[in-house]
């Protein structure tokens, strides 16, 4: 009995905190919810002065309402990093509570690949959609992003690790979520978009530490 209990405890811990190779897989959020999400664990030890985030997602919500794509909160700032879709506008990108917009003239229902980067030294933001760059913009020059973070997929955090609204939740698939603590070059982003090799050092989809809450499923990815 003691051996069985020990096995169950170890299995539970492995599910919550162990590393998983998520290659060719995606998290599926099948319905609107304020309780379903995925929490990602990142080995950050110091504040970020630059970063790049790349991922795939697939949803039918874009012409209906806004939704959160990537939410990185700290105890001082719930929108430390936020990638959000704003209906009738396009992509909203936030660092340290300050927001800029990248308009999308036409919305189609198809898997989308995005990469976005920011650096403190210049404040320059780059935003790439399906391998194509938008015009560079500037945001929060001189700012540093906190390291003690709650990173959530599927919900927007209005407080550290919680206070979700179902009307901002993602309904659909998300995968290939990777993050670096530096700005990737255009050639590197193009390589990632085409499926080439990469070595993320903050979040690595091929060695992902995560915990699922609520109704979220892991399924084969639907994009190439």
Curated annotation (Swiss-Prot):
Positions bound to Ca(2+) 1: 78-79, 156-158
UniProt cross-references to SUPFAM superfamilies, sorted A to Z: Concanavalin A-like lectins/glucanases
Induction context: The concentration of CRP in plasma increases greatly during acute phase response to tissue injury, infection or other inflammatory stimuli. It is induced by IL1/interleukin-1 and IL6/interleukin-6.
Alphabetical list of Gene3D superfamilies matching this protein: 2.60.120.200
Sample GO molecular function, one term: choline binding
Tissue occurrence: Found in plasma.
Sites where the protein binds Ca(2+) 2: 156, 158, 168
Needed co-factor(s): Ca(2+)
Domain Pentraxin (PTX): 23-224
Modified residues (Pyrrolidone carboxylic acid): 19
Location relative to the cell: Secreted
GO cellular component terms given for this protein: extracellular region; extracellular space
Cofactor note: Binds 2 calcium ions per subunit.
SS bonds (residue pairs): 54-115
Signal sequence region: 1-18
Major site of localization recorded for this protein: secreted
UniProtKB keywords: Acute phase, Calcium, Disulfide bond, Metal-binding, Pyrrolidone carboxylic acid, Secreted, Signal
One GO term (biological process): defense response to Gram-positive bacterium
InterPro entries for this protein: ConA-like_dom_sf (IPR013320), Pentaxin_CS (IPR030476), Pentraxin-related (IPR001759), Pentraxin_domain (IPR051005)
Superkingdom, natural source: Eukaryota
Residue ranges of the TM segments: none
Family: Belongs to the pentraxin family.
Role according to the record: Displays several functions associated with host defense: it promotes agglutination, bacterial capsular swelling, phagocytosis and complement fixation through its calcium-dependent binding to phosphorylcholine. Can interact with DNA and histones and may scavenge nuclear material released from damaged circulating cells.
Additional free-text comment from the UniProt record: This protein owes its name to its ability precipitate pneumococcal C-polysaccharide in the presence of calcium.
Subunit structure: Homopentamer. Pentraxin (or pentaxin) have a discoid arrangement of 5 non-covalently bound subunits. Interacts with FCN1; may regulate monocyte activation by FCN1.
Protein name, per record: C-reactive protein
Species classification: Eukaryota, Metazoa, Chordata, Craniata, Vertebrata
Gene: CRP
């Amino acid at each position: 009995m003691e051996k069985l209990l020990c096995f169950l405890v170890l299995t539970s811990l492995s599910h919550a905190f162990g590393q998983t190779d998520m290659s060719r897989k995606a998290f599926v959020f099948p319905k609107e919810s304020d309780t379903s999400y995925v929490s990602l664990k990142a080995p950050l030890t110091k504040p970020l002065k630059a970063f790049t985030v790349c991922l795939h997602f697939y949803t039918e919500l874009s012409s209906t309402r806004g939704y959160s794509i990537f939410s990185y909160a700290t105890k001082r700032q719930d929108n430390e990093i936020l990638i959000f879709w704003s209906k009738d506008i396009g992509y909203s990108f936030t660092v340290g509570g300050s927001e800029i917009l990248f308009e999308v003239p036409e919305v189609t229902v198809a898997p989308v690949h995005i990469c976005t980067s920011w650096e403190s030294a210049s404040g320059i933001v780059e935003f790439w959609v399906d391998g194509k760059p938008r015009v560079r913009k500037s945001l929060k020059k001189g700012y540093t992003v906190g390291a003690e973070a709650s990173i959530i997929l599927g919900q927007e955090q209005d407080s550290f690790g919680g206070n979700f609204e179902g009307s901002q939740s993602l309904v659909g698939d998300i995968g290939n979520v990777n993050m670096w603590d530096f700005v990737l070059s255009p050639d590197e982003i193009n390589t990632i978009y085409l499926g080439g090799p990469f070595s993320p050092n903050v979040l690595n989809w091929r060695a992902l530490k995560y915990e699922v809450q609520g109704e979220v499923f892991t399924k084969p990815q639907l994009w190439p």
